[in-house]
From Swiss-Prot:
Alphabetically ordered keywords of this record: DNA-binding, Transcription, Transcription regulation
Matching PANTHER family: TRANSCRIPTION ELONGATION FACTOR GREA
Gene expressing this chain: greA
Highest taxon listed in the record's lineage: Bacteria
Classification via InterPro entries: GreA/GreB_C_sf (IPR036953), TF_GreA/GreB_CS (IPR018151), Tscrpt_elong_fac_GreA (IPR006359), Tscrpt_elong_fac_GreA/B (IPR028624), Tscrpt_elong_fac_GreA/B_C (IPR001437), Tscrpt_elong_fac_GreA/B_fam (IPR023459), Tscrpt_elong_fac_GreA/B_N (IPR022691), Tscrpt_elong_fac_GreA/B_N_sf (IPR036805)
PROSITE patterns registered for this protein in UniProt: GREAB_1, GREAB_2
Gene Ontology MF terms in the entry: DNA binding; RNA polymerase binding
Signal peptide: none
Homology family: Belongs to the GreA/GreB family.
Protein name: Transcription elongation factor GreA
GO biological process: DNA-templated transcription elongation; regulation of DNA-templated transcription elongation
One protein family per Pfam: GreA_GreB
Gene3D superfamilies: Transcription elongation factor, GreA/GreB, C-terminal domain (3.10.50.30), Transcription elongation factor, GreA/GreB, N-terminal domain (1.10.287.180)
Species whose genome carries this gene: Bartonella quintana (strain Toulouse)
C-alpha cells in the first residue's frame, strides 16, 4: 500500500470530513430515503432517486476518505527545517514577468487548494521547486505559457 504524504492539518481535515459524513450526512440521507419511500411509487419518485444518488456519492466519498486516512504519512511541518524546499515548505515567490509576489505551501494531493495557496506536491510548480533554495530562479511551464519565479523566502511553519 503506497503511503500518501499529508500535513497534520490536512490529515485532521480529512478525519473531520469522514466523521461528518458518517455521523451526520449518512443518517440525514437515510431519513430522506425513508421519507421518499413513504410517498409511494418509487419508479417515478424524484425525491427517492435524488436521495439514493446522494447516498451513493456519500458512501463513495467515505470509502475514499478511509483509504486516504489509512495510507496517510502524516508530516508535522513545524518540525521540518532546512534551506532546501521539500514537502510542507511555505515559499514566497516573485513572478519575474509580472513582479507579482505569491505564497504557496507544498502539500499532499488531497489537501491542494490553489485558492488558499496550497499546491500539490505533484503539481508542475511544486516539482520545479523541490530541492531549490532562496535566491534560485525556476521556470514553470504552465497552460498559459512559461513563467520564471525567483524564490524569495522558504519557511517551515
Amino acid at each position: 500500500m503506497e503511503k500518501v504524504p499529508m500535513t497534520t492539518a490536512g490529515f485532521e481535515s480529512l478525519k473531520k470530513e469522514l466523521r461528518w459524513r458518517q455521523q451526520e450526512e449518512r443518517p440525514r440521507i437515510i431519513e430522506a430515503i425513508s421519507e421518499a419511500r413513504a410517498h409511494g411509487d418509487l419508479s417515478e419518485n424524484a425525491e427517492y432517486h435524488a436521495a439514493k444518488e446522494a447516498q451513493s456519492y456519500n458512501e463513495g466519498r467515505i470509502n475514499e476518505l478511509e483509504d486516504y486516512i489509512a495510507r496517510a504519512e502524516v508530516i508535522n511541518v513545524s518540525r521540518l527545517s532546512g534551506d532546501k524546499i521539500k514537502f510542507g515548505a511555505t515559499i514566497k515567490l516573485l513572478d519575474e514577468d509580472t513582479e507579482e509576489k505569491k505564497v504557496y505551501q507544498i502539500v499532499g494531493d488531497q489537501e491542494a487548494d490553489v485558492k488558499t495557496g496550497k499546491i500539490s506536491i505533484s503539481s508542475p510548480i511544486a516539482r520545479a521547486l523541490i530541492g531549490k533554495q532562496e535566491g534560485d530562479v525556476i521556470e514553470v511551464n504552465a497552460p498559459g505559457g512559461a513563467h520564471n519565479y525567483e524564490i524569495i523566502k522558504v519557511q517551515y511553519i
